[in-house]
Amino acid sequence: IRNMEGDLGIGHVRYSTTGASVAENAQPLVLSYIKGTLALAHNGNLINTPELKWELIQNGAIFHTTTDSEVIAFHVARERVHSKTVEEAVLKTARKLKGGYALVIMSPRKLIGVRDPLGLKPLCLGKRDNTYVLASESCALTSVGAEFIRDIEPGEMITISRNGIESNKELSTGKHAHCVFEYIYFARLDSMMDGVKIYDARIRGGKSLAKSYPVEADL
């Protein structure tokens, strides 16, 4: 990373949930279109992918992967053609999505993060010196020497550019529905998620389980 040039970057470690575990489905996805280039990294699952994909196919889209992430990227690119800004295109696309997701989208001059309205999937913001970082977990910030600032709120979109950070909460509904599987399985023990330490959550969950379903165990 130190040898790379530029002031914006995007990366992804894929946990296969949609599409086969093949190189073609690796992220980030990079698109070249009439407005330039666009890169997208996505964590989550959509429940209306077939409808969104069919809409694109009817307009001539040709897909190179079997992921719902490519469907999202195509919609952002398509909306960008008819929008004044990338942020506007992202918001238009996000309003079409049904499911849980955390997105990081990179244009030549901006890094945009958006979290689904219910906060099913996590996304957080960190800072190292004069550099801002978006990640699914706080432990990812630690690994690059960044300090955790805060969680991105459900329905919030964050834009990072040379002008600093801007927040947009147009997608927020005021309702939260965090995925319990993040706390018991997906997240790393040393992560902090929506104000909760993952390690503590698992300890408390285990105690609650033992009270609800006590068993005679030889430990």
Task: State each model region's role.
Residues I1-P154, T159-L219:
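Conserved short alpha-helical segments that host acidic/polar catalytic motifs at enzyme active sites
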